[in-house]
């Protein structure tokens, strides 16, 4: 059974889209920027202020979901940790299951894993081996895409299970760092609600 926005929100897809476009400018303003965190020269984009404002959070989730309203989505996979918050809300909205993608050693059952590149070195992400069945349609979610290393690893991990990756969704894209372009080059559509310059 596939839910539609009308069933979830009590209004048509067009009405929701008009509403979110009307207040979309608020979303970027609701993200707090913290200079020199976690190190000098970095502008940290803090989405906890967006998540803490009910109107902004609702608008962000509605806007991220909009392209798949009425579509069959089997699972939403969220990257630890803020991807859990956003992904859980999206999974609820599209009436799908939710799959956590976690750092190595955090899941209790048998896992599949994938190594991915960091700025300096590498790390490993995992998910339960039985979390996704071959052919299931999956949306990948995280809060922000910068260099795209973690998202790239997550896509490879999902493909290892036979998932069909419908899209990768983010609240924020830092386009100068090239992550979204890298994901598109992997054949995965990218949806981001806003862009910020720099890193």
Swiss-Prot record:
It catalyses: AMP + diphosphate = 5-phospho-alpha-D-ribose 1-diphosphate + adenine. The lineage of its organism: Bacteria, Pseudomonadati, Pseudomonadota, Alphaproteobacteria, Hyphomicrobiales. Catalyzes a salvage reaction resulting in the formation of AMP, that is energically less costly than de novo synthesis. Gene3D superfamilies: 3.40.50.2020. It is found in: Cytoplasm. This is Adenine phosphoribosyltransferase. Belongs to the purine/pyrimidine phosphoribosyltransferase family. Pathway: Purine metabolism; AMP biosynthesis via salvage pathway; AMP from adenine: step 1/1. GO terms for biological process: adenine salvage; AMP salvage; purine ribonucleoside salvage. Signal peptide: none annotated. It is an enzyme of class 2 (transferase). The keyword Chaperone does not apply. Pfam families: Pribosyltran (PF00156).
